[in-house]
Amino acid sequence: MTQKILLIGNSDGIGAAVTRTLIARGEQVVGLSRSPSPLGPDGPRHILQDITAPEYPQVLATLLANEGPFDVCIFCAAIGSKLTLPDLSQEARVIDVNFTSMVRTLAALAPGWLERRQGHFIGLSSLADDFYNADSPAYTASKAGFSHYLVSMGLKLRLHGVYVTNIRFGFVDTKLPKASWKPLMMTADQAAAHVLRCLETKPRQLSVPKFAGLAIHGIRWMQSIRIWWS
């Protein structure tokens, strides 16, 4: 059965890979991002929009009014950051793009889904949500908020027929990773395959690769001990 899917932040990286795969499967796709569609003018409908702009919620409301309800929304938008003191000027924007805009997107979609008692929101988070990073505090904070919010909303909304999936990726070969060392890095197409599987299985949370997730959790545990005793 064909699904109607809204992709936020699908102009490159994992979002672009997911878009290409969904189109090949025959799904009905609408994309929204600040940059043009990865498939060009012959691709599916694509809306150019900065998701941090004040008018973004109204753009979503108009889209829902004109297009009708979506079965699924996949939120792929994210930006990285590397903090170089004393410049903190981009910290708030990172949190706005990565976290606040996701919350605003779900807020626009949830009422219709609750009324229909069906819908699925998939958010792309990061294993970086589980440790402290002095070089990228806004990024790790945004992903920590992202993951905690989506898992919590999933617990709330699933009781009403609406599914929420939080996918925590390790390093993916896109423009996003800022680290010099990127172990167990996967391609955007490999990451997209995990997203597509989540469309079918609807887990509350998926962490990939799992070994990296366990390693990062261990790092967080050691960080917490050091901070506790500092």
Describe the residue ranges of each PLM region.
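N-terminal Rossmann NAD(P)H-binding glycine-rich loop of SDR-like oxidoreductase domains
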Residues: S11-R20
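Conserved NAD(P)H cofactor-binding loop of Rossmann-fold oxidoreductase domains
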Residues: I74-K82
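Short alpha-helical oligomerization interface
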Residues: L83-D96
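Active-site helix of classical SDR
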Residues: L106, S142
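Residue(s) in the substrate-gating loop at a strand-loop-helix junction
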Residues: S126
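Active-site loop-to-helix junction immediately N-terminal to the catalytic Tyr of the SDR YXXXK motif
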Residues: Y132-T140, S152
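C-terminal helical subdomain
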Residues: N166, W181-H217
